[in-house]
Amino acid sequence: MGQPGYFAKPVPSFGEPGSSLLIVGLAPGMHGANRTGRPFTGDYAGNLLYSTLHKYGLATAAEPLDANNQANARLSLSGCRITNAVRCLPPQNKPEPAEIRQCNGYLAQELAALPQGAAVLALGTIAHAAVLRASNHKAKDFKFAHNARHELANGLKLYDSYHCSRYNTQTKRLTDAMFHQVFESILEHHKLRS
């Protein structure tokens, strides 16, 4: 988006490759990851995500931003990695199917780097569908539902959550407790390690 001080490039994943949990979001937010260069950093969704990761011992800090409103350099992840179905800022903040297809190879590489039996958390239906496409599964065989767990043929476990967007939390489609419950389900079934 050509704004001064913005990262405005494809946003790379954050966290160690091959971690036991891969969190897949939708796309970089206009004034979030598009500005900071880190997934879920600088927008409301990131505040909920990183505070939840910190609560469960998966992040060293709850705050994605530092005092200068930049990506918190002291924040690191343990046992998890964060990526998006689309790596670039989409028009109107919603990716088109062609963009999802274009970026799906990157997501397939992320999935291939995961250890056997790893967990994948899809934040929203678009991320859910992108994970299924990248892992060569049919969407009709794995219906999206909040806090659902799907066993994929490649040994991965796919978990679903409503996206942690401001809209979903303001409308109470997703509450903090509901989001925490998803992480509790994941941690119940997986020992997360870097």
Across the structure, where does each feature detected by a protein language model lie?
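A polyanion-binding, active-site-adjacent surface
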Residues: 1-144, 152-193
